[in-house]
């Protein structure tokens, strides 16, 4: 049985840990609002970009000059999984949920006889994926030195992906990230970005509007598609950022509560043990006095 001194040390250590988790919870809460606003502000632009490209792509359907970013390479043998995770841990299942989704997709593709490659954005995802797919990771990007995410970070990643696509290193690219829904809900998401999965432009009940494009549709798409890749990556980074702080805030709140419960139980055991020792000493003193 532990001594009273050991119990006091353990209680003090738990209280110190509780202070740290509480401080981390407050920091995450303060950063969450700004990250959430940035993620929600980026969604309409990214979604509208998809809609515009879908409309133009529908008009250019069947064109022999269609960009490979839209039409593809004509095959889907080699898949590049662009996995975006965080740079830090202590955020519950945030990182592992994204990695699990990418890992399951990789195994499914390999079972179909496809070749899989990984492009890791974020240290935590790389550390988990290299345990299984070390030889299949072709590139990593770490953003831990970036104090505030900007579009330039997404453009840099997009350029590297496009360079590999132009070199014929893969046929299909899928982006993995965590979509922010709320503080307690972050949804691991997979989005095909190369070739672009064109949505049905005619969703309304009425006839689809007719547009005339100047310059030609193919020329417009050649300029829009590379930028759209950067836009979708930037959106994923912002969604990840908000999801990370939401997950960290929840994880640290749970850790603080658990620490409080541990302190309560440890204090109760300490008091009972101390009371038992005092009672034992009193009994010994009384017994000794009676013997005299």
UniProtKB/Swiss-Prot annotation:
Pfam families reported for this sequence: ATP-synt
Q: Which GO terms describe its biological process?
A: proton motive force-driven plasma membrane ATP synthesis
Q: Does the keyword Zinc apply?
A: no
| Entry keyword set | ATP synthesis, Cell inner membrane, Cell membrane, CF(1), Hydrogen ion transport, Ion transport, Membrane, Transport
Location relative to the cell: Cell inner membrane
Q: How does the record say this protein sits in the membrane?
A: Peripheral membrane protein
By its UniProt entry, which InterPro entries does this protein fall under?
ATP_synth_F1_ATPase_gsu, ATP_synth_F1_gsu, ATP_synth_F1_gsu_CS
Q: Which CDD domains match?
A: F1-ATPase_gamma (cd12151)
Gene Ontology CC entries for this record: plasma membrane; proton-transporting ATP synthase complex
| Molecular function via GO | ATP binding; proton-transporting ATP synthase activity, rotational mechanism
| Major subcellular location class | membrane
NCBIfam families listed in its UniProt record: ATPsyn_F1gamma, PRK05621.1-4
State the protein's purpose. Produces ATP from ADP in the presence of a proton gradient across the membrane. The gamma chain is believed to be important in regulating ATPase activity and the flow of protons through the CF(0) complex.
Quaternary structure annotation from Swiss-Prot or TrEMBL: F-type ATPases have 2 components, CF(1) - the catalytic core - and CF(0) - the membrane proton channel. CF(1) has five subunits: alpha(3), beta(3), gamma(1), delta(1), epsilon(1). CF(0) has three main subunits: a, b and c.
**What does the similarity note say?**
Belongs to the ATPase gamma chain family.
Q: What protein name does the entry list? A: ATP synthase gamma chain
**Source organism:** Nitrobacter winogradskyi (strain ATCC 25391 / DSM 10237 / CIP 104748 / NCIMB 11846 / Nb-255)
This chain is encoded by the gene named atpG
């Amino acid at each position: 049985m532990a001594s009273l001194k050991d119990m006091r040390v353990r209680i003090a250590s738990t209280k110190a840990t509780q202070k740290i988790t509480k401080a981390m919870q407050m920091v995450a809460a303060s950063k969450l609002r700004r990250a959430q606003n940035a993620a929600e502000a980026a969604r309409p632009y990214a979604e509208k970009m998809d809609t515009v490209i879908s409309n133009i792509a529908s008009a250019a359907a069947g064109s022999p000059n269609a960009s490979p970013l839209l039409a593809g390479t004509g095959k889907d043998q080699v898949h590049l999984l662009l996995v975006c995770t965080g740079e830090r841990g202590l955020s519950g299942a945030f990182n592992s949920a994204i990695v699990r989704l990418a890992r399951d997709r990789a195994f499914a593709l390999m079972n179909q006889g496809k070749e899989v490659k990984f492009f890791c954005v974020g240290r935590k995802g790389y550390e988990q994926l290299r345990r299984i797919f070390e030889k299949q990771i072709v590139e990593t990007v770490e953003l831990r030195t970036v104090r505030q995410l900007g579009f330039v970070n997404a453009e840099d990643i997009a350029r590297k992906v496009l360079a590999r696509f132009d070199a014929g290193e893969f046929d299909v690219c899928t982006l993995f990230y965590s979509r922010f829904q709320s503080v307690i809900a972050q949804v691991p998401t997979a989005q095909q970005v190369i070739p672009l999965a064109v949505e049905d432009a005619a969703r309304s009940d009425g006839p689809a509007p007719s547009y005339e494009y100047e310059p030609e549709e193919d020329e417009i798409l050649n300029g829009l598609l590379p930028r759209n890749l950067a836009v979708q990556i930037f959106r994923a980074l912002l969604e990840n950022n908000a999801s990370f702080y939401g997950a960290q805030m929840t994880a640290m709140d749970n850790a603080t509560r658990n620490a409080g419960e541990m302190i309560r139980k440890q204090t109760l055991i300490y008091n009972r043990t101390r009371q038992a020792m005092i009672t034992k000493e009193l009994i010994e003193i009384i017994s000794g006095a009676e013997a005299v």
